[in-house]
Regions:
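Short beta-strand scaffold segments in enzyme catalytic cores
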Residues: 38-47
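Short, basic and Ser/Thr-rich N-terminal targeting/leader segments
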Residues: 34-38, 85
């Protein structure tokens, strides 16, 4: 694999878990606002948080308001540059094709996700967008960090929505399928 030098990061499992917990907090905020609970954090090479985001599609009525996009936008503003070289993005759910493409364009070094998205996962599950040799940039991928916590958050959110039957038709279109959910029951975020 042709991984750029700036992507060869040395991060411990404990550091990954610490930052993933912050992404989980963002996901909880999304759920509290009525959005699918997905959260993201962008961390620079020195360990500073430069961007935070959470799913805000319902709040903003914007199909591009995914957690990763929100976090990358904030990181670019914070750094004053669209190239986010040397950064790691922590996200609770595997990025979709749109977000994976944005992460390539932002030149992130590494993507760490909590659980796979079997319907739209684009960095491991269906595609490996961040590792395509044909693209102008590649990034490292690490999955299943705090997997149980990330899956639990999604399951809990959708269980409540099912019980309340609020937006039942929309629910079937919004729920991501993780590798432990019924694939007939859960479309993508």
């Amino acid at each position: 694999m042709n991984t750029p030098p700036e992507a060869k990061t040395r991060v411990t499992q404990a550091q990954d878990e610490t930052f993933m917990r912050l992404a989980i907090e963002e996901a909880r905020r999304a759920a509290e606002a009525g959005d699918v609970p997905v959260g993201a954090i962008v961390v620079d090479a020195s360990g500073n948080i430069v961007g935070r985001g959470r799913n805000r599609r319902e709040v903003c009525q914007d199909p591009t308001a995914h957690a990763e996009i929100e976090a990358v936008r904030e990181a670019a503003r914070t750094r004053g540059a669209w190239r986010l070289l040397g950064t790691t993005v922590y996200v609770t759910l595997e990025p979709c094709p749109m977000c994976a493409g944005a992460l390539v364009n932002a030149r992130v070094a590494r993507v760490v996700y909590g659980c796979k998205d079997l319907k739209a996962g684009a960095v491991d599950t269906h595609f490996a967008i961040g590792r395509l040799i044909s693209l102008n940039h590649r990034f490292e991928v690490q999955g299943d960090v705090l997997y149980d916590e990330c899956v639990s958050l999604l399951r809990g959110f959708f269980a409540v929505r099912r019980k309340s039957k609020v937006g039942q038709e929309q629910l079937s279109q919004d729920e991501p399928t993780t590798d432990t959910t019924d694939t007939n029951d859960a479309p993508t975020t």
